């Protein structure tokens, strides 16, 4: 029984890691914030541009201090000038002039259906399975959760707890 419980616990932890896709992004600095209006993005499939060079990255980072530049960069993210999209790890995008993000790829999930807005407090949207919050250091923390594997994780955890309690009661 103890071996089974140990395996169940390992499986639960592994499932939790998978459910979060191992993806926790931290964006430092000033975010592009819009009016909060939802805009529908036109067009079909778009190719994702290549990441900028180190020189472009440094220039982009330095030029955004006053919020007037069309480029922005941090240690894990960059915003391509002229591309109208914010890219972070190739998995998220943000149209110019809004604070709406997408999960599931750079060209999927149109604005207004599976969107969430970053702000000064925690925000979660069940459609896009995205959670964000902004801490005191002006960092926006972005976490993507796979709801299917998350539910599976919760079931495994509940099973582990029930087995542990049952085994403890049998001793008495």
Swiss-Prot record:
It comes from the Eukaryota. Residues 53-69 have a biased composition (Low complexity). Residues 29-42 have a biased composition (Basic residues). Keywords: Glycoprotein, Membrane, Signal, Transmembrane, Transmembrane helix. Residues 162-172 are cytoplasmic. Residues 27-69 are annotated as: Disordered. Glycans are attached at residues 135, 138. GO terms for cellular component: membrane. The chain crosses the membrane at residues 141-161. Its main location: membrane. It is a single-pass type I membrane protein. It is found in: Membrane. Residues 1-22 form the signal peptide. This is Uncharacterized transmembrane protein DDB_G0291364. It comes from Dictyostelium discoideum.
């Amino acid at each position: 029984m103890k071996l089974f419980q140990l395996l169940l616990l390992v499986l639960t932890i592994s499932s939790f890691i998978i459910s979060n896709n191992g993806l926790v992004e931290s964006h430092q600095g000033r975010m592009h914030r819009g009016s909060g209006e939802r805009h529908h993005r036109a067009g079909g499939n778009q190719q994702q541009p290549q990441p900028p060079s180190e020189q472009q990255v440094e220039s982009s980072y330095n030029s955004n201090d006053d919020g007037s530049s069309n480029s922005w960069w941090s240690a894990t993210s960059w915003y391509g000038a002229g591309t109208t999209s914010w890219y972070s790890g190739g998995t998220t995008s943000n149209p110019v002039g809004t604070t709406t993000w997408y999960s599931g790829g750079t060209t999927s999930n149109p604005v207004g259906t599976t969107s969430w807005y970053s702000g000064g407090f925690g925000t979660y949207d069940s459609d896009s399975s995205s959670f964000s919050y902004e801490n005191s250091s002006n960092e926006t923390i972005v976490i993507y959760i796979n709801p299917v594997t998350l539910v599976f994780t919760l079931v495994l955890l509940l099973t582990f707890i029930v087995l542990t309690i049952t085994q403890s009661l049998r001793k008495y």
